Amino acid sequence: MNNTKKDQYSSQSIKVLEGLSAVRKRPGMYIGSTDQKGLHHMIWEIIDNSVDEMMAGYGTTVKLTLKDNYLVEVEDDGRGIPVDIHEKTNKSTVETVLTILHAGGKFDSDTYSMSGGLHGVGASVVNALSSSFKVWVNRDYKIHYIEFKDGGVPLKPLEIIGTDSKKQGTRIQFVPDFSIMEQFEYDETIIADRIEQLAFLNKGIKFIFNDERTDKKTKQEWLYEGGIKQYVENLNASKEPIIPQIIYGEKKTKVTLPKRNLEVTMLLEVAFQYTNGYYNSTYSFCNNIHTNQGGTHEEGFKNALYKIINRYALEKKFIKETDGKISKEDLSEGLTAIISIKHSEPQYQGQTKDRLGNTEVREFTNSVVSELLERFFLENPEEAAKITAKAVSAMFSRKRSEAALESARKSPFESASLPGKLADCTTKDMEISELYIVEGDSAGGSAKSGRDRFYQAILPLRGKVLNVEKANHEKIFKNEEIRTLITAIGAGVNPEFSLDKIRYNKIIIMTDADVDGAHIRILLLTFFFRHMFPLIEKGHVYIAQPPLYRVSYNKQNKYIYSDAQLEEWKNQNPNVRYELQRYKGLGEMDDVQLWETTMDPEKRTLLKVSINDAANADKTFSLLMGDEVSPRRDFIEKNAKSVKNIDF
């Protein structure tokens, strides 16, 4: 990265807006929640500051270290937070940045032309929510140090504690304040996935993750010189591309927004490739933040594909005027794409930054991608024909499946439209209703008898669930079990899926605790992920946890849910005589047992299905359920030891 910039990063770059007191009162407003997700968000805030420094052209390496007792350390080799006295606070700029909300370089467009933070409050918020917060700044050949306690109270002003002529940058250590935050463990998988994503999105920056916690002791490094091209390559590792090339382009521009009298800088990168799959794997980002609801950058990208491929299809006689247009949905089939824009003045729709709203981005992206794809088609006619043929095939498949789709999208509350095998609940109150998807008629019969009919519905699956990863839309929507699921849930399928129409608040998958049951679970989850993604995204999908064993002793029964729990019980009761029954299937339990162990809200355990990284989940579903055997074997070998529940 270039370290010789004409602009100076000093106290003059730091703008001060307001104090910190609100953060401890309402932490959810600043980091989303106080649970495990909030704990991880605190890490992201500090890492994002370091990445912003790299994006501004200073430094090459960001290192995260987890230590025992919840201590987190983030270090970079950027310029270091300014250490001079700030004119408005009469304190060091380091202390100003870390104790005053909205005081940060992100508010000075000369300092950071593009950054992830909409408000620039990250470091001070983390300080406010930490019991201990320590900062070392290597700058101007000196080592500066300041320490805060109990939500941002400085122990003493910034001091010089040594010299170092070879090193520059910032090192921060913090421990969350568990009088505010809930005490969860840091999840190394979630952290590693996010850091790897940052490495893909910021080519040439090295990321290091050291987990030094007791019993962990791992080190991972990421450096992707190919950036988002390598991201697409990674996502397609278990897929079969129909063209060998990854289409890639980037462009930087400055535009003036007349209504705001403001000049903005935009840097766009796009990389995409078509595969022989049936699903859309498009992921968009603005300033490294995943915009999972899309926005103007995605709209511009799709508009460009729509314009160029439809024009090419007509010119080369792949379709006639009477066939109609290839839709944007058709063009998304088998597409893997990364759209990454860096913007100096991003405008998001909603507090969570999940949709980009800048109107100037739409035209900029459309223009760049149109020019890129048009040139690619001109220079690569064979690949252009394959891409177009894929889109045309998707169009005709869609048209053939429309009748099947229509029958699956009937009004959810018309009893005549509900499948005959569904034992529906009495209530029409979606907020309390539950749908149990049960494996087989035998278990379905016990579930129907044992349920609370008022709010629990039962849908037994008789046939084999289709692996939607390997099927086109026409085949999927002709499958009886799939049609039954769609009709029972009542909300349609992507892209018209509507959460407002779901008939049940909880969709609970209840299968046997064996290999076949696990296979049915993953088939159902694949369908929900590909065709009803908001169900998972908004937390409506659950996995029931039926017992593995029944221990009978002293004229009483105890239900046990794992081998580890069984061993624990044996160790605690070494002299007790008992009988042990292992449940091979749900059908071995009568209705009373099934209610007591698996369906009674007062006693049952449900696992909520959640997704932290949609792109990574996409890759995993493709790997596990796709055609490629070798990557699937590698994945299983790599992850087998970390699986807590597996039945061979």
UniProtKB/Swiss-Prot annotation:
GO terms for molecular function: ATP binding; DNA binding; DNA negative supercoiling activity; metal ion binding. Its cofactor is Mg(2+); Mn(2+); Ca(2+). Keywords: ATP-binding, Cytoplasm, DNA-binding, Isomerase, Magnesium, Metal-binding, Nucleotide-binding, Topoisomerase. Mg(2+) 1 binds at E439, D512. It catalyses: ATP-dependent breakage, passage and rejoining of double-stranded DNA. Binds two Mg(2+) per subunit. The magnesium ions form salt bridges with both the protein and the DNA. Can also accept other divalent metal cations, such as Mn(2+) or Ca(2+). Its main location: cytoplasm. The record marks K464, N467 as: Interaction with DNA. It comes from the Bacteria. It is an enzyme of class 5 (isomerase). Its EC number is 5.6.2.2. Residues 433-547 form the Toprim domain. GO terms for cellular component: chromosome; cytoplasm. SMART domains: HATPase_c (SM00387), TOP2c (SM00433). It holds the Pfam family HATPase_c. Mg(2+) 2 binds at D512, D514. CDD domains: HATPase_GyrB-like (cd16928), TopoII_Trans_DNA_gyrase (cd00822), TOPRIM_TopoIIA_GyrB (cd03366). One of its GO terms (biological process) is DNA topological change. It is found in: Cytoplasm. A type II topoisomerase that negatively supercoils closed circular double-stranded (ds) DNA in an ATP-dependent manner to modulate DNA topology and maintain chromosomes in an underwound state. Negative supercoiling favors strand separation, and DNA replication, transcription, recombination and repair, all of which involve strand separation. Also able to catalyze the interconversion of other topological isomers of dsDNA rings, including catenanes and knotted rings. Type II topoisomerases break and join 2 DNA strands simultaneously in an ATP-dependent manner. Belongs to the type II topoisomerase GyrB family. Few gyrases are as efficient as E.coli at forming negative supercoils. Not all organisms have 2 type II topoisomerases; in organisms with a single type II topoisomerase this enzyme also has to decatenate newly replicated chromosomes. Heterotetramer, composed of two GyrA and two GyrB chains. In the heterotetramer, GyrA contains the active site tyrosine that forms a transient covalent intermediate with DNA, while GyrB binds cofactors and catalyzes ATP hydrolysis. NCBIfam families: gyrB, PRK05644.1. This is DNA gyrase subunit B.
